[in-house]
Amino acid sequence: MQGPSQLALFYFANGLPPDDIQDLFQRLRSQSKTESGWTLRAFVVQATNALREEIRQLPHHLRNPLTPLDNALDLAVVPDWRRGPLAGALEGVLLCLIEIGSLIAYYERTPDPFKFSARTACFTGIGTGLLAAAAAAASPTLADLPRLGAAAVRIALRMGVLVAETSQSVEAREPDAPADNWAAVVMDLDEDTVREELNLFNASTNNLGPSRLFISAGGTDNVTISGPPSKLRQVFRVSEKLRSARYAQLPVYGGLCHAPHLYNCHHWTWIMEPINGAAFNQNMVDTAPLFSAGDDVPFEASTPRQLFESVVCDLLMGMIRWNRAVDGVVELLGQTLPSECQVYAFRPCAVVTGMVASGQVKLPHCQFQTHDLLGWTCHDDTDNGPTCREDSSIAIVGMACRFPGGANDLNQFWDLLEQGADVHRRVPADRYDVESHTDTSGKSRNTSLTPFGCFIDQPGLFDAGFFDMSPREAMQTDPMHRLALMTAYEALEQAGFVPNRTESTHLKRIGTFYGQSCDDYREANAGQEVDTYYIPGGCRAFAPGRINYFFKFSGPSFDCDTACSSSLATIQMACTSLQHGDTNMAVAGGLNILTNSDGFAGLSRGHFLSKTGGCKTFDCNADGYCRADGIGSIVLKRLDDAQRDNDHIFGIILAAATNHSARAISITHPHAPSQAELYRDILTRAGVSPLDVDFIEMHGTGTQAGDSTEMESITSVFSPGVPKRSRPLYIGSVKANVGHGEAAAGVMSLIKVLLVLQRQAIPKHVGIKTALNPRFPNLDRLNVRIPHDQVPWPRSPTRKRYALVNNFSAAGGNTSLLIEEPPVRPEPKADPRAAFTVAVSAKSKASLKNNLRSFLAYLESQPSISLAHLSYTTTARRMHHNHRIAVHGSTLSSIMQELEPYLPAVDTHRPVPNTPPSIAFVFSGQGSFYTGIARQLYEHHPGFRLQITRLHNICLSHGFPSFRRAITGDLSNDGSEAEPIITHLTIVCVSIALCRLWETLGVKPCVVAGASLGEFAALYAAGVLSASDAIYLVGRRAQLLQELCTPNTHAMLAVRATVEQIRNVLAGQPYEVACINGSSDITLSCSVADIINLQLAIEQHGYKCTRLDVPFAFHSAQMDPLLGPFEHIARGVTFKAPNIPVMSPSLGDCVFDGKTINASYMCNVTRNPVKFVDALETARGMDLVDAKTVWVEIGPHASYSRFVGSAMPPGTATIASLNRNEDNWSTFARSMAQLHNLGVDLNWHEWHAPFESELRLLTDLPAYQWNMKNYWIQYNGDWMLRKDGKSSAAAASHPHQAIPPALRTSLVHRLVCESVQETRVEVIVESDILHPDFFEAMNGHRMNGCAVATTAIHADIAFTLAKYLYSSIMPNSTDAPAINVKNMQVQHGLVARKDRSRPQLIRIRGIADVTRGLVSLSWHLVDEQGRRVEESFATAVAEFGNHEAWLEEWSPMTHLVVSRIDVLQRLADDGTANRLSRDMVYMLFNNLVDYAEKYRGMQMVVLHGLEAMANVTLAAPEQSGGKWTVAPHYIDSVVHLAGFILNGGNGLDPRRNFYVTPGWKSMRFARPLVPGVRYQSYVKMMPIREQSGFYAGDVYILHEGQIVGLVGGITFRTFPRSLINTFFSPPDTMTHGGSQAGSVHQPACSERTLPVGPARQDSAARETLCQGHGLSRTVMDSSDSSPATTLTPPTLPSVAASTESPIVHRAMALIAAETAIELTELSDETAFSSIGVDSLLSLVLAEKFTAEFHLDFRSSLFLDCPTIGDLKAWLIDYC
């Protein structure tokens, strides 16, 4: 305790204490987490925020090592921070953190008060320690120190950055070189002697500018010398006195301080720029004095800001004289006469010991006692009490969704809500067969009691290539995981996420949090055939893990299951993670895709689900909820981070919490008091009154218990009656629209609320179908409203809008979020830039085309959009891909005009390579000067202006005149007023500033070249010269030029000719070759007297020449007088080895070493000819540059780009930095667009950062357009109903057994008998073709007015029996086999009788051969007693296969089929082929077949002779009716194009003949036929040579460009039309002895087998893959406009076939098979990572390779050979 007779003296050192720094910081961290450490905690938080703000503004290469910065104390563990360019700055920051933090901790742990006055304390220190001392001295109380301490930390960083940059301009540090000393202390010499030696050294070495050595500190027996490290070493070598004295290098690594010749008021003004605000400008009253290290009087300051300012000025420009500071402190002690002096320091040190000794001598009456402010760190008594953490609000900055009812984006979702849609429907066929899996009575085992749900359309759609997944992996990966990936990307895209752009987007600090409560796809779909990706594709943990892996997030990934509240509970986890600092950004959401009937069965039998349809939330007849798909993703950040990052904020999560209804009557029953407690907790945390919440999105499932309980809890808190609400409380539930998304329900509700806030309207509630639930309280009295129409909810200027999202779980958990509307942002100011770059990119050509198309449509619809915002969004706030287009313009219309030509050319647009091109910098010379160089950049780009200002200060420090007028345009337009020193300094300084600007933007050279004056800037760029030395040499040379050379006595002439040509023309005339810029571009120098004669002679010989407007003839004899003096000057400059190669035009060579470039070389730069083309050719020969190198010209005008273009191969890219007569912004916008299109990884953030506060992120731009295919494993059969393992095919002898559900369909009615043996299973079934379902199927295919069985009916029966028999053979299998119905032969047509009063029966016999895996099928006519009328009228064989193998087999022929479809389309466009509408097609078809509506799937047909294609859309489920395995009307719709060609086309004569099919060779569907989906059919019918009147062809069925079905060898036979009555009449009306059972004989075909395919069989595609080599097949050119004569599968690429070895072919086939990728897509450039060959698939491939080639292959082979080409080369070399 200090009394009146005590004085406290605080000393703040300039160096880190000798302790283990990391240990000290760890102890500070521990203290900050204690209950008593709240002040230290506040300091750390404020210091962290200050540092983050400063680090954000650093260039990327300086910023990257310091991010992410979660806590300022983490800087102590930055790797190798002492070796980096900011070593000095970081040391200053760490020193301030330790000294201020330890001071706070000391006073937190002791009873001594932190309160000082001018009479009780004084402060002093040295170096950066003075900043910490200033913060302490200016703090009236300990509570004020965190704010002022954070300011000191910020100042330390800014000053360190300034000192480092200024010092680097004086002498550049070599990359990766150890830190060098900028100061040395000399003992035993007085200050005058040392100064005399330094002056002598500086003068003798021409070192009189910024790099001169100087005295920075003086003491009684020592002097400190500061200066560039190389000069310091040199002076101790050449000065005898200094060399003889005792001296030591000081650990000063950050650069030069205490240097008045380097710094001025502009520097400290910049340092103090952010130190503003009331706290820094309050008057200080009776504060303790602060003594500098150079004076005996304290700093004079009345505010904290002034005190900091004085300290900064002293550190930059004041000299250290510590003895004077000690005298001042002792004098103060003498004035106050304390009896005790308590001296505080950070560890004992010699300085404190000396100061105490001096005080004891002069004040013997005063007792001195020292205290160690770090002493507390030695005690292990840290209070480990609870930490008080301040909650942070969480901003939602991005969102995306896939919701039922076609709501595949936010706009569609809002439209659905606005329209009040209820999108529930019957379970679609792509999930499971709703008929067989639903029994509303509940009697059938494992069936659902409800057929209803809400479903996402085509959830299998996915862009596998975008996410580097093979089709095989994509197929096996749960669609929840896949849609999570796509929605995560869309949400991140909307959030403007770019990896590592800011502190909060650093990949190390991003986590994913998703809720998921079921694994339907893994259990019901992928589980049918367990494969390589069954685990990573289906297990829940892989959903968020896959997102982390793809985006390279290193933060946590969590998959959470809390049943119905999973997504909202997981979002709360994400908020907690953000608030605790575990992450800086989070991607969160919920996932639910329903494919497993078990969930429906269990929930409906548990009385959760409605049997009558959708969720009737709030309705009196609410009877349960309706299950729903749902995928939602959101992006979260801390609010301050989001605002700092310039994000668009959709809403703010003020508070989130979860509790449990532990007191409920059962685990599934909600509990109102528990829910109410949760709401109150959240409101208390947020500090919001419940009466201020205007909208609540309730859980609202539509259950009686749930709705009434939730309404009770809501009204009890938010509308209790007393006090009465002044504004209505609106409530609603999205489940009435889109169902209950279960694990995704919470994120569904949250996204709805965010849209409500954005659209400023509450959509109507559609859950009340009859009347309000009577169990609810009187809502009108409570002022609670359920919106029956849309209600406006606009922003208010006086109050904020709040909404609550409520979610509870069937397992008892309750989760709620309180949402606040986003903050209002002021209107942005106009952007000063005159032109902008806009970019569009994608990972595939298809996506690029669609992205471009949607982007242009957006621009067309938004003519008033800000071009600045558009540029910012599409460049700085987008992840860019290899397929890219960037354009520039000054208006929106010009941008559209630039983009539109790319749209038709996308297919030929080449992607940029994965490896960026090399960059070469070319610095142009003095011939390009004009006034106003870089004027717009200087006026409006802060970073560029700062660089020019600092370079200008260097010029002034060298004694050179100001060159600013040349930039601001105050000189005459042609620059004639400017002296050479002005023009030369301007060019070199602008070039250096441009070089730094390009490097800040990520454009860094691998080689540099400079022409004439440009070589000085080039040497700076290569690290040979510092900026100061480059400026010094240029300025001194210009001065010598003015002093020793007479202007306008010599001239220069640019000539378009070779040196040899001019030598012949000017033989004997006086001239010199000054520049050889190209083979036919040279410059001559001569006297003015001779220039006219030279020009005339040259022009007379037909060569073009131009006289240059320059006052001196450089690189000529005119330069000779200045060479000697200039070399003498240059010897005083430090030359270093280049960091990158230098193309030297003065040598015509390339320089790598540190000896070539010296003072003599600089004279050569002035005198020798510029041999630019020689230097360039040498660089090409050394492979320093090549045709792909991008040349960036740096200088006032792009004068050398033409020379580069002429010397390099055609197409070489040249980029301008500035252009005469063009706005700087236009030049840069164009150049950055060019660089981006060339694949250069630009740092767009840095380009927009100076203007970002006035830029806005456009969140309504079209989302990425995916290149999707439907990856879907269809659940087949009904094995989910029979999981007990018992076969339903028990042996039986009864003629009519109860038919199993799996066998009963609309076409199979009764089980006659079933026999099961060891290797054989037989089943006989019976069907009545007059049964309503069967007859309806036949009656939809009417011929000659009769109901005739289409062969598709027989196909469906075949599929049904084959699938049933497979389950009998494999009773324990969960696999759904692929079935090929082969060799279908129909001998007799089947026509229904007119008399339907009695049955008309057929029986079908199926015999399964277990050993061969085949099922033989035969159809028989029987009478009513079951007796056969005759032998079989149809036969077929069913063979079991593999869906994926079929797709792989068909893949090689896909492009051929598609190309033929395209040809037909083009023929139709030009009128050569016929394009027929749906009505026209079936009108023509009607001359033979009258199809019912559900059979009429062909929507359009293009017909050309016997070749045709059709667009097909299958009938909707409500039209279909019945129960089918593969519905006959679906089969017929995709296949009967073949029959239409013959019976409705113009290739044959359908008036005389008709054509019917007796069968086909094979019928396979690799994907289920799905209603509503668009398919394409293609077939070319060909006559069979061997059999007159027969035609055959292959019908290809395609979906989204992929062959998904193939009916191979479908055959038709010709019959005279006169026989149609004979063949197609009802059997009971026939008079010529027709069969009583209803068969109709086909003439001459019952006694023999018909050919069922053309000469080529569809197995040829499989042969292509299996043979692997030696094939010789014909591939049609898709550009051929004539119909093909044959359709054959594609071969392997012709080049490969001719040059590759058989082993390569086999390897490629294996890879194609395992990845499910077409062989044609496996180019040499294909990276294995891009086609999904990960560690798992590598193991599989290695195993397959080993088995195939009988060699030992390791999975690491695909790491060693990352591309297909690499693998091919390896196989050729080693196999």
From Swiss-Prot:
The keyword Phosphoprotein applies. InterPro entries: Ac_transferase_dom_sf (IPR001227), ACP-like_sf (IPR036736), Acyl_transferase_dom (IPR014043), Acyl_Trfase/lysoPLipase (IPR016035), Ketoacyl_synth_C (IPR014031), Ketoacyl_synth_N (IPR014030), Malonyl_transacylase_ACP-bd (IPR016036), PKS_Beta-ketoAc_synthase_dom (IPR020841). Residues 1309-1621 form the PKS/mFAS DH domain. Residues 1472-1621 are annotated as: C-terminal hotdog fold. Residues 29-258 are annotated as: N-terminal acylcarrier protein transacylase domain (SAT). Its EC number is 2.3.1.-. Pathway: Secondary metabolite biosynthesis. This is Atrochrysone carboxylic acid synthase. It comes from Aspergillus fumigatus (strain ATCC MYA-4609 / CBS 101355 / FGSC A1100 / Af293). The gene is encA.
